[in-house]
Amino acid sequence: MEVFMVSFTLLLGESTFSLGEGFGINTNVFETNIINLSVVLGLVFTLGRNFLISLLDARKETILRNFREADQRAKDAEARLNLAKTELELAEKSAMEIKKQSVLSAELEKKNKNTKIEADTARFKQTQQETLTVQRQRAISKISKQVVNSAITQVKQKLKSSLDSRVQTVINNYKIHKFIEYKPPGN
């Protein structure tokens, strides 16, 4: 305590601080009353302590409030991060599903196109074959008609040149004889 008093005296010097006419603070430690000094120090410690405690409590509340707010913001940020991760996973799954569907659609479309091309090709070949068959039949029919007409013309010419009444009589007699000998089946 003596060290404190000596230090206090040296700091303040021997000056007197006066607040008014009848009241004053004597800064000389040796001239002051220990009771007055203890009262002043008690007031300083009591009031200062209460002020310091209230200041520290306010600071503590501010720090705790800031900590709770920061903790809440961290929880909110973590919740938003988890939500964003979930949405990202859903988006990735959706993208993969869309990709799969597009690949399957493309393959199905390709298969359908190939099937249609094969069917069109088969139909074209069948039509081509039918056309060739029809043209062949027409050609055969035309040639047959020409051959028949030519044969008929030749037969007519031969008949005109070789048919006379005597040959005609022989042919008629032969046909009559065949007709007479004819017996219907079942008789």
UniProtKB/Swiss-Prot annotation:
Keyword field: ATP synthesis, CF(0), Chloroplast, Hydrogen ion transport, Ion transport, Membrane, Plastid, Thylakoid, Transmembrane, Transmembrane helix, Transport
Regions crossing the membrane: 34-56
Predominant cellular place of this UniProt entry's protein: plastid
Molecular function via GO: proton-transporting ATP synthase activity, rotational mechanism
Cellular location(s): Plastid, Chloroplast thylakoid membrane
InterPro entries, per the entry: ATP_synth_b/b'su_bac/chlpt (IPR002146)
Bilayer disposition of the protein: Single-pass membrane protein
GO annotation, cellular component aspect: chloroplast thylakoid membrane; proton-transporting ATP synthase complex
One family name in Pfam for this protein: ATP-synt_B
Annotated family: Belongs to the ATPase B chain family.
Complex and partners: F-type ATPases have 2 components, F(1) - the catalytic core - and F(0) - the membrane proton channel. F(1) has five subunits: alpha(3), beta(3), gamma(1), delta(1), epsilon(1). F(0) has four main subunits: a(1), b(1), b'(1) and c(10-14). The alpha and beta chains form an alternating ring which encloses part of the gamma chain. F(1) is attached to F(0) by a central stalk formed by the gamma and epsilon chains, while a peripheral stalk is formed by the delta, b and b' chains.
Function: F(1)F(0) ATP synthase produces ATP from ADP in the presence of a proton or sodium gradient. F-type ATPases consist of two structural domains, F(1) containing the extramembraneous catalytic core and F(0) containing the membrane proton channel, linked together by a central stalk and a peripheral stalk. During catalysis, ATP synthesis in the catalytic domain of F(1) is coupled via a rotary mechanism of the central stalk subunits to proton translocation.
Additional facts recorded: In plastids the F-type ATPase is also known as CF(1)CF(0).
Alphabetized HAMAP family for the sequence: ATP_synth_b_bprime
Protein name (database record): ATP synthase subunit b, chloroplastic
Organism placement in taxonomy: Eukaryota, Viridiplantae, Chlorophyta, core chlorophytes, Chlorophyceae
